[in-house]
Design a protein with these regions (language model features):
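Conserved RecA-like ASCE P-loop NTPase motor core of nucleic-acid helicases/translocases
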Residues: 134-140, 462-463, 533-540, 663-665
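Conserved pre-motif I regulatory segment
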Residues: 75-111
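N-terminal presequence-like segments and the immediate start of the first folded domain
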Residues: 1-61, 67-74
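A contiguous, basic/glycine-rich beta-loop/short-helix subdomain that forms a polymer-engagement track
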Residues: 227-260, 270-280, 385-508, 515-522, ...
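Conserved helicase motor "Helicase C" RecA-like lobe of SF1/SF2 P-loop NTPases
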Residues: 540-564
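Signature of the SF2 helicase/ATPase Hel1-core->accessory helical subdomain module
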Residues: 129, 145, 150-153, 233-234, ...
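A substrate-engagement module of RecA-like helicase motors
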Residues: 75-82, 132-260, 322-323, 327, ...
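Conserved RecA-like P-loop NTPase helicase motor core
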Residues: 505-515, 565-669
Length: 711
């Protein structure tokens, strides 16, 4: 069998076999001419191609795809020629080949790709080359927007891809014109600030084409107005809505259904797949390729959607809609106002009974407290009263009919949450600000997720920079029931031996003591000052974050920023624009934050990020592990902490020109046997226990970068 090139254009479209010859309508330049004169790498690719084609002519297009992917990522391949700044990376090429093979076989691939591997291109190119319907799911809205607005268009242009694409977010990301109109008609009792935002949204609504609220720059992303002018699956009127034909959610879904490539996020995907919550379920059966980026989040998100929950926000929203319906459509039913006020009051009282904010606890234990149980009973009674009052006015108001359906759902869900006798679930609650959440979560989602995969005959790709523990994938595969998946671990191309330094300081203060924050701040202030800020201090608790921020603000002549002082995006912008700031943060800043260059050259972590032992979700997983005969500390707690630590450390080096130090303020990393599991899971950085050497390393690298930039 021979290969002949029959079209001079630089793109792939079709291949045919005739007289035992493979004819390609466009072979890239590095495959043109006599194949005997090609490089060894090209010959190897051709050899694999011919082996895979064999005598089965139906395989020719898949084989073409395989060879095309190798050529795309070659030294003089199409990406090098068409994507500015693209440099071939062996790990990226390996991942692209693995993705191609899984697409061909309709298999499951779990790929850990270290920072800088270029995993986005490694899955985009094979997916687009295949021509199959593809869903790409991300862990955050930020990555979703970046993928759709930057990465996808780049690859589409490079490959001359002629398919269509769509971006689909959850319904709470789109303006609801009907709910906006309701607020305009009945907004008399709104706070002045919220009412002003309603007017801003009203003005923006006359200009927007897609209703995506992230584009309404005149209103803060965390404004209280957004829940009032967006819909949920519970309060949406569906086809009964007077503005149904103008619905932005409906329009976005139609675009997604018609598109060849759809970009969503994990919450949207799981909500639809598990509880049919988003209304784009028609996409799932049609999709032939499912790709999950930031896939380390999937186990926890899946647990959330395979369970049930009831939140104070849902109940406040229900009461609010009852009041709006009373004021605009059923003004003779004054009991609607009274029962809604009663429900609102009982929600507030129950929240107060839970005590401190930012606390997560065991719901089974909580309900043993007679006082708390009394408040929950009063809340249940108020919900029943609202249900009974709304029932008297059914058919008079679409808004009220929708609210009645939600009340029915919530009262049944609350009764399910109060019945803590059902085995196999974790019962837990969380209090935050003026709100609370009551939830039940299955102890394990492995069986359910395995069935989800089996029910869709598609190719499944899961990828992230943080999936393995101690260079093994078993922790991840066991949690999702994917023991038979193909796994791949690709190291980062960054030179951590020269770009980074890992420090575990000597003479650290004891953990979890009232004076820990004060002593840590005193110990680390000189390093931060000498580095001119440019530092993230990642904390494992809000209490430590607040304590450290207070100490640093009193002692450092630098901008000290703290998570919660403003929105996340605003905080990052201020950090970058300052150029010499210290950002003290927790939780959401451990991952999904990308700060490149000299602006960030030091990441400090207060201690190993073990989940609090009294966390109800952790306790449930520990119980499940023990029932299966496992060692909970080894099999659950350590892997959880390793993945989180890898995420935190990953904030530092985002580019080949970055440098910096990682300081972990926890002796256990070097004094306990399990510390080796953490160290072997981190990038291979040189290590020290000296803060002085760490400061010297940072100053030397800063000087070197200044010389390079000046030259």
């Amino acid at each position: 069998m021979t290969i002949k090139r029959i079209d001079p254009e630089d793109r792939w479209s079709e291949a045919v076999i005739y007289n035992d010859t493979v004819y390609y309508t466009a072979v890239p330049e590095n495959l043109s001419g006599d194949i005997i004169e090609q490089t060894a790498d090209t010959l190897a690719a051709i050899d694999v191609l011919l082996q895979r084609v064999g005598s089965d002519k139906s395989k020719i297009l898949d084989a073409t795809l395989f060879l095309a992917d190798k050529a795309d990522f070659a030294e003089n391949g199409i990406l090098t020629r068409r994507v500015p700044g693209f440099h071939p990376r062996e790990a990226q090429r390996q991942m692209a080949i693995s993705v191609t093979e899984v697409i061909d076989k309709q298999g499951v691939l779990i790929a850990e790709a270290g920072t800088g591997t270029g995993k986005t291109y490694a899955y985009l190119v094979p997916a687009l080359r295949s021509g199959k319907k593809t869903i790409i799911s991300t862990g955050s809205k930020a990555l979703q927007d970046q993928l759709y607005s930057r990465d996808l268009p780049t690859i589409i242009e490079a490959l001359d891809y002629d398919g269509t694409t769509a971006l689909l977010k959850g319904r709470s990301n789109y303006l609801c014109l009907e709910r906006l109109e309701q607020q305009m008609l009945s907004g008399g009792d709104l706070e002045a600030e919220v009412l002003a935002d309603v007017m801003h949204v009203r003005q923006w609504s006359t200009q927007t084409e897609d209703g995506d609220i992230s584009r309404c720059h005149s209103v803060a992303e965390d404004s209280k107005v957004w829940p009032l002018v967006t819909s949920t699956n519970d309060n949406c009127l569906g086809s009964d809505c007077p503005r149904y034909k103008e619905c932005y959610v409906l329009s976005a879904r139609k675009n997604a259904l018609a598109a060849d490539v759809v970009v969503v996020n994990h919450h949207l995907f799981m909500a639809d797949t598990v509880v049919k919550d988003t209304g784009f379920g028609e996409l799932i059966p049609d999709a032939e390729i499912m790709i999950f980026d930031e896939a380390h989040q999937i186990p926890d998100i899946a647990s959330h959607y395979f369970g049930q929950q009831l939140t104070s926000r849902q109940l406040f929203d229900l009461a609010r809609d009852m009041i709006v319906a009373y004021r605009t459509e059923v003004r003779d039913q004054v009991q609607l106002q009274k029962s809604a006020d009663r429900l609102t009051q009982m929600v507030q009282d129950f929240r107060l009974s839970l005590g401190d904010t930012g606390f997560r606890g065991n719901l089974r234990e909580l309900l043993q407290n007679k006082e708390t149980k009394r408040y929950l009973t009063l809340l249940d009674d108020a919900l029943e009263l609202s249900y009974d009052v709304m029932k008297l006015s059914l058919g008079r108001s679409q808004l009220l009919d929708s609210a009645f359906e939600r009340a029915t759902l919530y009262r049944n869900r609350l009764k399910r949450l109060i019945d803590t006798t059902i085995a196999g679930y974790s019962y837990w609650f969380e209090s935050y600000g003026r709100h609370f959440l009551l939830a039940i979560t299955p102890l394990s989602v492995a069986d359910k997720f395995r069935e989800l995969i089996k029910s869709h005959k598609s190719s499944w790709i899961f990828t992230s920079a943080t999936l393995s523990v101690d260079e093994k994938m078993s922790y991840y595969t066991d949690r999702l029931g994917l023991e038979n998946a193909t796994t791949l671990i690709l190291n980062s191309p960054f030179d951590y031996q020269h770009q980074t330094l890992l420090c575990v300081p000597r003479y650290l203060p004891p953990l979890n003591q009232p004076y820990t924050a004060k002593r840590l701040a005193a110990m680390l202030a000189p390093v931060i000052l000498k580095n001119q800020g440019r530092c993230f201090f990642l904390c494992t608790s809000h209490a430590m974050m607040r304590g450290l921020a207070e100490e640093f603000k009193a002692s450092l002549p630098l901008p000290v920023l703290m998570q919660g002082e403003m929105g996340k995006s605003q905080l990052l912008k201020k950090f970058v624009s300052s150029g010499n700031a210290l950002l003290v943060a927790t939780q959401s800043f451990w991952e999904g934050v990308d700060v490149r260059g000299d602006t960030l050259s030091c990441v400090i972590i207060d201690k190993l990020p073990f989940t609090a032992p009294d966390d109800p979700l952790l306790r449930a997983r520990i119980e499940d592990c023990q029932l299966r005969g496992g060692d909970a500390f080894r099999d659950v707690q350590i892997p959880d902490a390793v993945i989180t630590l890898k995420q935190g450390v990953g904030r530092l080096i985002r580019d080949i020109h970055d440098y910096g130090a990682i300081i972990v303020c926890d002796d256990r990393l070097v004094s306990r046997p399990y510390g080796e599991v953490f160290l072997s899971s981190l990038p291979p950085s040189p290590r020290t226990r000296s803060l002085e050497k760490t400061s010297y390393f940072l100053s030397q690298r800063a000087q070197r970068n200044e010389i390079v930039s000046e030259s």
